[in-house]
């Protein structure tokens, strides 16, 4: 039943009890509705719900009690206390309890065990041979019970023995701590008896676990070791100074030792190098019997030394000469070295080139180099060394037989006086222009001459 239906039924009952009048308008009290306010009849509904929940809880408790195997065993045990049980029944109940403890079975297991017990009793009544087996089983069960009792008894003895050992250790510990208790006994007597409670033993255990506290004693100033006199301070300073001196001396000794080790190592390395060099000198496969190789070696060394000296002296001379000429003027340089002047260049050294010979320019750089300065650049090189005038007329061209060959050799064998040549196309126009200019210049000169004559006559 939903909450809305219960509310409708409640309102309907109230209307019927009030004779068909509204609950809100009946009586002097006016019931007003407010948003969020719980109505009066809601309390009754809550009570019903709580009653219903209590009933459900009671049912669940009863079900749990019925399903609990321990309660079932207790009920069976209490119900069977007045009835004398046989050996078979005790055995069956023990087996049933054992199965319940191991498997945590429900009441269904209990019912099955009871039914099993009934079947066993019937089998015992029907068959006499099984009685002997059951008797043997009962004997075994009794023996098992005796073993369990012995095991429990031994465990209890071990527990008691262990407890006695702990008590004995505690007594020995208290005897060791007894002197400290006597020292602190006087201060404890001053305390009130309100602290003597059940927790006193625990407090004492915590207290005795802490290190002992001794009573402070007064020591005279002269007997104290914390206050130092002037003599003690001076003695400590002297000891510190002596310690510093010892450390300094130790460092000096260590430095000397390291230096000695370094020198010894260098000496050993030098000796090893000398020994190796000596062995190399002694071991010579190519021995010089007549001394010719040694003479050649001496000559090479002399030449090398001479070249080094010459190079060094030449560098020094050039450096000085450069500094001297740098301070001179251009006129002084030309007077000192007239060969450098352009007017004194000798063109007679230039030779006549061969037929179809290439002409190489001397260049404008590296003129100070003796090799470049004295070299004859007009001398033929390569293919120019051959006389090409001896070749046939067809082969007297440049790059004969190559893709870059030319039709003409030079302008000497070409007629440059042709009228239809490119350089003669404007010759007639130039000649006409020059003639016209000459005529105009001659006429102007004649007019000037006549004017001069007339002027002279007039003045005369």
Curated annotation (Swiss-Prot):
Matching Pfam families: MFAP1
Residue segments, region Disordered: 1-291, 411-460
Origin: domain of life: Eukaryota
InterPro entries on file: MFAP1, MFAP1_C
Residue ranges with Low complexity bias: 17-28, 105-114, 434-450
Main location: nucleus
Annotated gene: mfap1
Gene Ontology biological process terms in this record: mRNA splicing, via spliceosome
Listed name of the protein: Protein MFAP1 homolog
Family recorded in the similarity comment: Belongs to the MFAP1 family.
